[in-house]
Amino acid sequence: MAGRYAPSPSGDLHFGNLRTALLAWLFARSEGKKFLMRVEDIDEQRSSKESAESQLADLSALGLDWDGDVLYQSTRYDAYRAALEKLDTYECYCSRRDIQEASRAPHVAPGVYPGTCRGLKEEERVEKRATLAAQNRHPAIRLRAQVTSFDFHDRLRGPQTGPVDDFILLRGGQEPGWAYNLAVVVDDAYQGVDQVVRGDDLLDSAARQAYLGSLLGTPAPEYIHVPLVLNAHGQRLAKRDGAVTLKEMLIDAPLHTIFSRLASSLGYEGVNSAPQLLEIFDPTTLSREPFIY
């Protein structure tokens, strides 16, 4: 049994990222689970080794420890390919503009792929494949879903039902890449992760991931989607809000003060270290409301 934190190494972690990481660590450690670290670096254009090292150093500085070696998704491509071959899939030749225009149809739910390429005849596929090849582009690979919704359980929100469409498993374009939904399901199963603590901006992904896990024969983990940190304007905190990364905050405050701010955002005052917070952490008292930075 294990929890995990899985950042994408595209820059320094900000206060909201650090808070979610702390919560993932607290939930796992307080329940006697292993805590694993995974670097989600499948977006090779945005990811960097330097960002990964910086993120891991920040988490360690805050007192978060993990079990075993860090797993890098960039080493797992063979596993994703093996999983893909087990699934019912089809090629998608749509551009982003194609999907946006098709999604404006009144019968299509926002954010749901309308299935444009699902029923194409083979001769149509050959033609569209050739058109993309002439542009040095590859088709995407989509799951041929057999349901339009799927049930899952969230520890903070109870029973949930979310939309499922023919979502992308392998991104197309000039540089194809593995999609988040496939990679995260395969890696959670591989690592034995049975508890996923993450921001509630990813709640909409849970139904797709739980459904995909069912197709691959892996049980869904316990989902715990925690409230985000928002800025003063009620928008999700971002690095552009200024002085929100650990390095920036350390300019004006010592590390124990920054940790105290993180603990305070969870409702614990006067706590200056991860071990101290772990001793008193009570998941039942976690606020369901976002924290305003």
Curated annotation (Swiss-Prot):
Q: Which cofactor does it need?
A: Zn(2+)
Record-stated family? Belongs to the class-I aminoacyl-tRNA synthetase family. GluQ subfamily.
Motif 'KMSKS' region, residue range(s) on this chain: 236-240
Explain how, and how many, cofactor molecules are bound: Binds 1 zinc ion per subunit.
**Stored HAMAP family:** Glu_Q_tRNA_synth (MF_01428)
* GO biological process, any: tRNA modification
Read off the lineage from the record. Bacteria, Bacillati, Actinomycetota, Actinomycetes, Mycobacteriales
UniProt lists the gene as gluQ
Residues bound to ATP: 239
Q: What does this protein do?
A: Catalyzes the tRNA-independent activation of glutamate in presence of ATP and the subsequent transfer of glutamate onto a tRNA(Asp). Glutamate is transferred on the 2-amino-5-(4,5-dihydroxy-2-cyclopenten-1-yl) moiety of the queuosine in the wobble position of the QUC anticodon.
Q: Where does Zn(2+) bind?
A: 92, 94, 113, 117
Q: Which SUPFAM superfamilies match?
A: Nucleotidylyl transferase (SSF52374)
Q: Where, in this chain's numbering, is L-glutamate bound? A: 4-8, 40, 180, 198
Any single GO molecular-function term of the entry would be: ATP binding
Q: Which protein, by its recorded name, is this? A: Glutamyl-Q tRNA(Asp) synthetase
**Entry EC no(s):** 6.1.1.-
Sequence motif 'HIGH' region, residues = 7-17
Q: Which UniProt keywords apply?
A: Aminoacyl-tRNA synthetase, ATP-binding, Ligase, Metal-binding, Nucleotide-binding, Zinc
Q: Which GO terms describe its cellular component?
A: cytosol
